[in-house]
């Protein structure tokens, strides 16, 4: 088949939807943020993890962090396996595509790593839900580029991997990753904002009480 005939519109004809590994990868991608949002909200309301670790919120948060990190490794393994089961597309096998893939992987990992360095373990892995709040909003890089560097950096890494393998199925799964993360952000941002708003209201109330006592 001539390369010209293999246009962009033809990309998704190179996705083998019958492969079980594709569905499993898509399920893992959706499961992870669903899992950590459910667990974190339950922790916020009931402190079930903190109680399980003898009242130590820090240790409980680290436990959730390790769990989330482990699930991320499983998700990445399943994604790579799904790509290996899929056909490649000639348009995605060029030299410049590979350069773009490496650039996306580098930038994606830069966003993820620097955001983790800015927030720390508890800031990255939902410490707010455990009552471990940061003093203020982080505004330095990468948060001056995007408000969700972990999510967008991860999406860039998924896209970079898809291009590196030359797999249209990877592009499809990357679009799914982005969709899932955007939905997660819609749930997480307002909830987290309310946690800090509540902290600020309590501080203001305490300050007002102190002034009255004086």
UniProtKB/Swiss-Prot annotation:
It catalyses: a 1,2-diacyl-sn-glycero-3-phospho-N-methylethanolamine + S-adenosyl-L-methionine = a 1,2-diacyl-sn-glycero-3-phospho-N,N-dimethylethanolamine + S-adenosyl-L-homocysteine + H(+); a 1,2-diacyl-sn-glycero-3-phospho-N,N-dimethylethanolamine + S-adenosyl-L-methionine = a 1,2-diacyl-sn-glycero-3-phosphocholine + S-adenosyl-L-homocysteine + H(+). Gene3D superfamilies: 1.20.120.1630. One of its GO terms (biological process) is methylation. Residues 20-40 dip into the membrane without crossing it. It is found in: Endoplasmic reticulum membrane; Mitochondrion membrane. GO terms for cellular component: endoplasmic reticulum membrane; mitochondrial membrane. Catalyzes the second two steps of the methylation pathway of phosphatidylcholine biosynthesis, the SAM-dependent methylation of phosphatidylmonomethylethanolamine (PMME) to phosphatidyldimethylethanolamine (PDME) and of PDME to phosphatidylcholine (PC). Belongs to the class VI-like SAM-binding methyltransferase superfamily. PEMT/PEM2 methyltransferase family. This is Phosphatidyl-N-methylethanolamine N-methyltransferase. It comes from Neurospora crassa (strain ATCC 24698 / 74-OR23-1A / CBS 708.71 / DSM 1257 / FGSC 987).
């Amino acid at each position: 088949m001539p390369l010209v005939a293999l246009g962009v519109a033809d990309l998704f004809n190179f996705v083998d939807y019958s492969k079980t590994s594709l569905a499993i990868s898509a399920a893992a991608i959706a499961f992870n943020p669903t899992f950590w949002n459910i667990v974190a909200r339950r922790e916020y309301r009931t402190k079930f993890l903190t109680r399980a670790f003898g009242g130590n919120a820090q240790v409980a948060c680290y436990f959730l962090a390790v769990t989330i990190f482990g699930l991320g490794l499983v998700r990445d393994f399943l994604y790579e396996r799904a790509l290996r089961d899929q056909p490649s597309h000639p348009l995605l096998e060029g030299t410049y595509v590979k350069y773009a893939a490496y650039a996306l992987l580098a930038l994606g990992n830069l966003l993820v790593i620097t955001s983790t360095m800015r927030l720390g373990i508890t800031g990255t892995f939902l410490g707010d839900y455990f009552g471990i709040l940061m003093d203020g909003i982080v505004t330095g890089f990468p948060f001056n580029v995007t408000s969700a560097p972990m999510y967008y950096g991860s999406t860039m890494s998924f896209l970079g991997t898809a291009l590196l393998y030359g797999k249209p199925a990877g592009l499809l799964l990357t679009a799914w990753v982005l969709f899932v993360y955007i939905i997660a952000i819609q749930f997480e941002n307002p909830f987290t904002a309310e946690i800090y708003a509540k902290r600020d209201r309590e501080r203001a109330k305490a300050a007002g009480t102190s002034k009255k006592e004086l």
